């Protein structure tokens, strides 16, 4: 039993270090853009509380440590997934934010890989449906979550030159439609998980009710440009993930 807890600890350490390293590189590449946005202007680099060289060293150190730690203490598959997370986030998603609005879809890929790191770290087959179910759960969850953020901060994103689907969507109509579409994808995914025997049917029923409840601000939205409904929908996405993961942990115990 103790060995399992140590394995969990090493997996968490390696995954966290890889994520922090990716975030450091992201902020290095976006110093000037972050300085233009109120929500990011107080980060260490744009606020000049940290030097570029120090951030570069921290980024490389954390990213390298995370991948190497996973390879040494967990397994090669976990290290490969961590390296893929860093590569996609830093070299594809980050620059893509400047030239194509589909960057949110691409950015959701590295954001959804960590559950796969945990899956293979625990000894699961990297091709197993259970691991990929968790990947798609995180993937589809991120989209409504970040659509709401990007709409609420759309003026800042436009000022910084980021190409987001919310750009120019003053009424919020397009963002609302996208929010609903990918929320339906979430519901469909969990129904598929139940239908294939990953967990009992009550999980799918409870999940569907939860998603519909949390979508209420968007479903009643009149595309009037009001911020309150979108903010409520965003807060709902924050509530959604821990509730669902706790429910899945209970169903799988």
Residue ranges and their predicted role:
Residues 116-126, 185-193, 240-253:
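Hydrophobic alpha-helical transmembrane segments in multi-pass integral membrane proteins
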Residues 2-6, 108-150, 154-155, 159, ...:
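Functional transmembrane core segments of multi-pass inner-membrane proteins
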Residues 1-31, 39, 63-67, 76, ...:
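Membrane-embedded alpha-helical segments that form the functional core of polytopic membrane enzymes
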Residues 31, 39-79, 170-194:
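Multi-pass membrane catalytic core of lipid/isoprenoid biosynthesis enzymes
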Residues 174, 215-243:
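Interfacial loop-to-transmembrane junctions
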Residues 16-24, 87-95, 136-154, 187, ...:
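Transmembrane alpha-helical segments that form the membrane-embedded catalytic/substrate-channel core
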Residues 52-123:
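Intramembrane alpha-helical segments
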Residues 188-213:
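Short alpha-helical packing/oligomerization segments
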């Amino acid at each position: 039993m103790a060995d399992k807890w140590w394995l969990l600890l090493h997996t968490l350490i390696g995954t966290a270090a890889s994520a922090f390293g990716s975030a450091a590189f992201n902020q290095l590449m976006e110093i000037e853009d972050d300085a233009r946005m109120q929500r990011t202007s107080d980060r260490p680099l744009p606020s000049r509380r940290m030097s570029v060289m120090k951030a570069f060293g921290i980024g490389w150190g954390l990213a390298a440590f995370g991948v190497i730690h996973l390879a040494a203490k967990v397994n090669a598959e976990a290290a490969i997934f961590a390296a893929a997370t860093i590569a996609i986030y830093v070299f594809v998603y980050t620059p893509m934010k400047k030239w194509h609005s589909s960057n949110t879809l691409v950015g959701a890929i590295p954001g959804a890989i960590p559950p796969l790191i945990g899956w293979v770290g625990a000894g699961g087959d990297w091709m197993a449906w259970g691991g990929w179910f968790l990947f798609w759960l995180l993937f589809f969850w991120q989209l409504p979550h970040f659509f709401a953020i990007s709409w609420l901060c759309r003026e800042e994103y436009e000022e910084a030159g980021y190409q987001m689907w919310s750009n120019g969507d003053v009424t919020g109509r397009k963002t609302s439609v996208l929010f609903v579409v990918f929320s339906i994808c979430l519901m469909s995914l969990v129904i598929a998980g139940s239908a294939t025997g990953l967990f009992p049917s009550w999980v799918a029923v409870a999940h569907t009710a939860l998603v519909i409840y949390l979508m209420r601000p968007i479903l009643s939205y009149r595309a009037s440009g009001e911020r309150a409904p979108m903010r409520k929908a965003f807060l709902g996405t924050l509530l959604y993930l821990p509730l669902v993961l706790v429910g899945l942990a209970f169903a799988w115990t």
